[in-house]
């Protein structure tokens, strides 16, 4: 009876069933549309003092129609920079220059964008769910919103304070 079930996109609280564990996606692998080349991450990540005190928004709406609303809201926010990227390497480099990044769900609840953000010391911004609460219990730094509309009420001062709060956890990388 001593066994555990590991699952990606686990949207059931691990508090309710101790035999369940969330299994993170991680970054894309090279067999996944040839996007996951590790050399996309080989460059000097900007020091946290030089990162933009904004939220990076760069995602398409093809994988999940809920993203259309997230994109609309992000364009209304004063602290979100919406960008399109020409290729994967440029996307990762741009991502690394921001303190925060919007990480809406993809085909499932998890998204590679979440893990790519952490690799370049950018805080993922996510919408709360049982899945996100499972990740929170793993001590992963993230900004959790109850509703994407909250993006319109966050100030740059809020972002600065939140980044400083999460920075030790982000630098330690013990998650």
For every predicted segment, state its role.
Residues 1-115, 119-140, 166-174:
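Nucleotide-sugar donor-binding catalytic core of glycosyltransferases
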Residues 153-175:
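A charged, aromatic-enriched C-terminal amphipathic alpha-helix characteristic of glycosyltransferases
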């Amino acid at each position: 009876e001593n066994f555990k079930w590991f699952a990606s996109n686990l949207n059931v609280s691990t508090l309710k069933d101790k035999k369940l564990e969330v299994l993170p996606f991680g970054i894309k692998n090279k067999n996944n549309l040839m996007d996951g080349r590790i050399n996309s991450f080989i460059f000097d990540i900007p020091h946290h003092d030089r990162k933009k005190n904004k939220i990076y928004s760069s995602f398409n709406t093809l994988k999940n129609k809920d993203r259309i609303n997230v994109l609309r809201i992000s364009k209304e926010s004063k602290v979100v920079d919406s960008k399109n990227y020409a290729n994967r390497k440029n996307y990762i480099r741009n991502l690394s220059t921001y303190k925060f990044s919007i990480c809406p769900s993809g085909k499932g609840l998890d998204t590679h964008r979440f893990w790519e953000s952490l690799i370049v010391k950018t805080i993922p911004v996510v919408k709360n769910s049982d899945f996100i609460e499972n990740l929170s219990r793993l001590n992963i730094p993230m900004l959790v919103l109850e509703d994407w509309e909250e993006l319109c009420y966050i100030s740059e001062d809020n972002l600065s304070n939140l980044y400083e709060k999460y920075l030790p956890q982000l630098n330690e990388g013990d998650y």
